[in-house]
Design a protein with these regions (language model features):
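Short, well-ordered secondary-structure "scaffold" segments embedded in the functional core
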Residues: 1-130
Length: 130
């Protein structure tokens, strides 16, 4: 499942669920990135984790650490900043995950997508009531 969050960490959109063997980047290329590229082309950054390395221009991911030595100080600072900026998006995942209907879901993947979409609606309604 792919989630798009606003800069404050509130979930705005959730994708349909893909089989567990589908890599994050493959699902993102199919479901999310085509919608985000126009914004990235206008300079709006898209932040992602290391699973999205190679996603394309405008998608910022941390620099991977390789076994041949420590990361350069610049790369470590870059990783720290990207991770800190991504923290609100992780909050968005937590907001969706708080609904008990999503605990230990064992139904078909097609139904999981509908349950997650309902959780997004409930999260939006809950936000409006505060």
């Amino acid at each position: 499942m792919q989630v798009i969050c606003d800069p404050g960490g509130f979930p705005l959109w959730v994708s349909d669920v893909r089989p567990g063997s589908t890599h994050d980047l493959t699902a993102a290329r199919e479901l999310v990135l085509p919608a985000l590229y126009p914004y990235a082309a206008r300079g709006l950054p898209v932040l992602a984790d290391k699973g999205y390395t190679g996603a394309g221009i405008g998608v910022h991911v941390p620099v991977k650490h390789y076994p041949y030595g420590p990361l350069h100080t610049d790369n470590r600072c870059y990783n720290f900043l990207i991770t800190a900026l991504r923290a609100p998006a992780e909050r968005g995942h937590a907001l969706l995950g708080r609904w008990r209907a999503l605990d230990r879901v064992t139904v078909s993947p097609h139904r999981i997508g509908a349950i997650v979409a309902a959780a997004l609606v409930l999260t939006s309604l809950d936000r409006g009531s505060r």
